[in-house]
Each structure stands twice: as structure tokens, then as C-alpha cells.
């Protein structure tokens, strides 16, 4: 184990706890560090799913959220191989990003956004992000060579393009992704549109006002984004739509616990302009009470 870890206990990040136990996570992190050492990577620190290493010109980061989800899905005898393959692939094009940040006209085709929990890394302020869903981050990334590169602010400024313009371009690219939209009837009464894709359903939901007007009801939309690849949207047209939340929450929970790329168990209201959070209360008996935002409650009861 590296010297800095001898003084600091490895803890499972909260957003990994439904995937992996404490002892297995310690094994996982140590395997990652040993593989990186064998590859000649100069690791500086580890914290909360983020391995910081000494790069050519500045410190770099390996975020473990995708790797840990792949790791737990393979047989134990193949887990170390999964780690080796992952980090070897990251070493194959170490200088490609230097070129991308020097040629915006070429790089812009790879711009995308991902929706992520706010605790994805303790150093998230170093990266280009914005907030669309309350309590979540919209993160600007390069989708290049079958991996996502989280774009740091010091990298993005090399393009000399306003950050909001970068997000606009990224969302145009997201609109070109192949996202399947299925219409289901929940509780024999409520229309629910389910967005399915490998990586970009949650990101695609940000385009609801321009690409999914059919999913917007008189009172807006009820949205759940349990994982990056699965989104639930109900067009709110009646004042009894809260009857849907129990069934919807249970369905979201199933995806959240089974899918390797979970995001949130919160529900959101798209009010035809912005996204707002439904209230959630944990009761003493272990149940959860979900209630409408005050603004929504007012308009549906008029």
C-alpha cells in the first residue's frame, strides 16, 4: 500500500455503498493503486473515489465511479484483469487530450454532458459544471476513445469559448445520441415515458422542452433519473398524479440498485422552464413521504 494510505483508512463513498462492502472496497482500491504503480503512474493521493496522480504538466485524476461498477459485475477471478485493462487503456492515448485542447473545431464534436451526484469528487470546483437538476451536477465531458474525460476549467479556457456556449454545443451533440423512448401505462392510468440508452438518457432529459414536448403536460412533467441510462417522465395533466409516485419510486429504486451507473432517487418537476425538486421526508417507521413543490401544489389545486 502507498505511504499516504497507511495513515488514512479507505472508506467506501456513500454513492458506492449499495454496490460494494467496506472490505471488498479496500481490496479494490489497493488493487487499483498497485496496478497504477506497475504502470509507472505517480499516484499522489486517494480520496472519496478520486485518485490524484502526477501528470506531465499538472496533477490528473482517475475517478473510480465507472470502474467500481464494472468491477462488481465481473467474477472475482476476473476483477483484477478488469482493473488492469481499464488503466492500461487510459495510458494508451495520454497526449491526445493535449491536441484536443489546442484544436476546438475538432474537439467540439466530442463534447457531451453527464448528470452526476455532487459528491463525485471532492475537487469538483476544478471542473466545468453547472446545475440543471437541483442537488445534482451537469458535468462537461469529452466523449473520446470510448471513455469520458471530465473537463477541467484550466483545460476549457484554452479554447477561449464561453462555458455556456460549450454546454450548448454539448447538448446539441447529446440530441444526436440514440435514446430509445418507450411509452408505458403505470397503475392502469398514468402515461410514463421511459428513456433508455447506455450513457445518455439522463443527459437527454435536459432537452425535454425542445425534443420531448409530448412528455410535458398542462402542469409540466414529473421526472425521475435513477441512472444515467434510465429516465422516467410523466406529463402532469391531472391533480391526482401524486398517486403515481409510490409505483414510480419503487420502479426507480429497482433500477438505482441494479444499474451500475446510478444517479438519484429524487423526483423532479419540470415547470416548463426549469427543474425543481419534490420534497422528501423520512419517517420514523422507515417510510418516505414525497410531496409537491409549493408552486406545483398551488397550480394543480386552483
Write out the residue ranges for each language-model feature.
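Short beta-strand
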Residues: 43-46, 222-226
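Short glycine-rich, basic-tinged beta-strand/loop micro-motifs
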Residues: 10-15, 50-51, 190, 225-235
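C-terminal structured domains
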Residues: 227-302
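Well-ordered, non-membrane alpha-helical segments in soluble/globular domains
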Residues: 24-29, 201-213, 241-253
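Aromatic/basic-lined ligand-recognition segments
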Residues: 179, 189-215, 219
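Charged, alpha-helical interface segments at or near domain boundaries
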Residues: 31-35, 39, 44-198
Amino acid at each position: 500500500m502507498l505511504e499516504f494510505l497507511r495513515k488514512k483508512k479507505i472508506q467506501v463513498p456513500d454513492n458506492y455503498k449499495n454496490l460494494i462492502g467496506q472490505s471488498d472496497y479496500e481490496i479494490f482500491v489497493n488493487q487499483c493503486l498497485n496496478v497504477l504503480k506497475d504502470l509507472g503512474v505517480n499516484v499522489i493521493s486517494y480520496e472519496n473515489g478520486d485518485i490524484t496522480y502526477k501528470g506531465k504538466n499538472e496533477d490528473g485524476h482517475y475517478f473510480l465511479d465507472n470502474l467500481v461498477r464494472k468491477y462488481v459485475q465481473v467474477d472475482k477471478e476476473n476483477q483484477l484483469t478488469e482493473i488492469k485493462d481499464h488503466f492500461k487503456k487510459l495510458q494508451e492515448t495520454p497526449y491526445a487530450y493535449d491536441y484536443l485542447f489546442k484544436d476546438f473545431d475538432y474537439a467540439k464534436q466530442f463534447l457531451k454532458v453527464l448528470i452526476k451526484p455532487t459528491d463525485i469528487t471532492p475537487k469538483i470546483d476544478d471542473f466545468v459544471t453547472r446545475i440543471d437538476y437541483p442537488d445534482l451536477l451537469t458535468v462537461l465531458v469529452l466523449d473520446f476513445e470510448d471513455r469520458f474525460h471530465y473537463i477541467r476549467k484550466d483545460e476549457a479556457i484554452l479554447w477561449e469559448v464561453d462555458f455556456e456556449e460549450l454546454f450548448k454545443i454539448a447538448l446539441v451533440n447529446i440530441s444526436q445520441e440514440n435514446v430509445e423512448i418507450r411509452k408505458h401505462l403505470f397503475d392502469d392510468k398514468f402515461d410514463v415515458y421511459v428513456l433508455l440508452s447506455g450513457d445518455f438518457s439522463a443527459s437527454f432529459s435536459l432537452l425535454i422542452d425542445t425534443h420531448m414536448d409530448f412528455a410535458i403536460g398542462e402542469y409540466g412533467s414529473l421526472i425521475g433519473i435513477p441512472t444515467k441510462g434510465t429516465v422516467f417522465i410523466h406529463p402532469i395533466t391531472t391533480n391526482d398524479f401524486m398517486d403515481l409516485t409510490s409505483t414510480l419510486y419503487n420502479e426507480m429504486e429497482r433500477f438505482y440498485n441494479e444499474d451500475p451507473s446510478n444517479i438519484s432517487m429524487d423526483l423532479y418537476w419540470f415547470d416548463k422552464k426549469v427543474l425543481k425538486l419534490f420534497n422528501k421526508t423520512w419517517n420514523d417507521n422507515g417510510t418516505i413521504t414525497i410531496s409537491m413543490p409549493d408552486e406545483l401544489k398551488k397550480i394543480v389545486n386552483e
